[in-house]
Curated annotation (Swiss-Prot):
Residues 60-71 have a biased composition (Basic residues). GO terms for molecular function: rRNA binding; structural constituent of ribosome. It holds the Pfam family Ribosomal_L4. The keyword Acyltransferase does not apply. One of the primary rRNA binding proteins, this protein initially binds near the 5'-end of the 23S rRNA. It is important during the early stages of 50S assembly. It makes multiple contacts with different domains of the 23S rRNA in the assembled 50S subunit and ribosome. This is Large ribosomal subunit protein uL4. Residues 56-77 are annotated as: Disordered. It comes from Thermosynechococcus vestitus (strain NIES-2133 / IAM M-273 / BP-1). One of its GO terms (cellular component) is ribonucleoprotein complex. One of its GO terms (biological process) is translation. InterPro entries: Ribosomal_uL4, Ribosomal_uL4-like, Ribosomal_uL4_dom_sf. Belongs to the universal ribosomal protein uL4 family. PANTHER family: 50S RIBOSOMAL PROTEIN L4, LARGE RIBOSOMAL SUBUNIT PROTEIN UL4C.
Amino acid sequence: MVACVVKDWQGADSGEATLDLATAKPETASHIVHRALVRQLANARQGTVSTKTRAEVRGGGRKPWRQKGTGRARAGSIRSPLWRGGGVIFGPKPRDYSQKMNRKERRLALRTALMSRVEDLIVVQDFADHLPRPKTKELVTALQRWGIEPEQKVLLLAADITETVALSARNVPTLKLLRADQLNVFDLLYADRIVATTGAIAKIQEVYGD
């Protein structure tokens, strides 16, 4: 169990929140998180890249010149991979890159990744009421009050994302906004700091606390 100090909108301490998630054993933790990360990145690939072999390139059906007597190297097609404009040898073809991982393993990897980042976790009170209208500047200022540097990559977790919060956050290039039930390993590991509302912490405990 991890206890985190809760900050209010102004950055002052206002309470405490706890997070209790089961994680992988130390000797297998990095391996299972790595597998989950590789799976996520592989599943994001479209796999639509395609090249043409010598059989698929247009033309090349006629032998360019006779086999013997010209003094030139023998050639059977102008679409040989050795020729400019020829086919591609062993080039990529459309394929499915997706990888399978058991649900229990995926959830264990996610919990392990999150608990490994508790040193970079900042818990704040739900602040949707402090943004009655979209205002990027107010959200950026609040992040600074919570101890985040302007150049740091931030993952902001909320139980529910209101329209004003979404509009306030979408123009900040270093900020990624996610619902607490949409956690993924890549975003957890990519961010420099993780900001979670108290509602998000409760939601994470509810969804992932097996």
